[in-house]
UniProtKB/Swiss-Prot annotation:
Membrane topology: Multi-pass membrane protein
Cellular component, GO annotation: fumarate reductase complex; plasma membrane
Name of the encoding gene: frdD
UniProt name for this protein: Fumarate reductase subunit D
Organism in which the protein naturally occurs: Vibrio campbellii (strain ATCC BAA-1116)
SUPFAM superfamilies associated with the record: Fumarate reductase respiratory complex transmembrane subunits
Stretches assigned to coiled coil: none
MF terms in GO: succinate dehydrogenase activity
Length: 125
């Protein structure tokens, strides 16, 4: 018995898995890490729950120049930007702004620029 479907032996490769991976990583970071960062830096330290000395310039600078700190700062800046730009790109399509490849390149180039700037700024510290 012959199956009623055909298998494409030369499928077209897509770049979507790369963008979906960055989108998912950015969304996860933004949902799980960013609220804790805002809680600690924006609420607990100003209220005095966490000692202000823990956030002194020397300690924060030391953290930012360590590999873990640098990766944390880059992740905090870059990953949510990839998530947001992926949403903007697909949101434009949903709103019938069919920008095609130009819109895709503009969105992802902007996210790439922010990611590159995050890396550059880490090396400037």
């Amino acid at each position: 018995m012959k199956p009623n479907y055909s298998v494409n032996t030369a499928p077209k490769r897509s770049d979507e898995p790369i963008w979906w991976g960055l989108f998912g990583a950015g969304g996860t970071w933004f949902a799980m890490i960013t609220p804790i960062t805002v809680l600690v830096l924006g609420i607990l330290v100003p209220l005095g729950v966490i000692d202000a000395e823990a956030m002194s310039y020397e300690r924060v600078s030391e953290f930012a120049t360590s590999i873990i700190g640098a990766l944390f700062i880059i992740g905090t800046l870059a990953l949510p930007m990839w998530h947001a730009m992926h949403r903007v790109h697909h949101g434009m399509h949903d709103l019938k702004f069919h920008t095609g490849v130009v819109g895709k390149i503009a969105c992802y180039a902007f996210a790439g620029l922010i990611s590159a700037l995050a890396v550059v700024f880490i090396f400037m510290i």
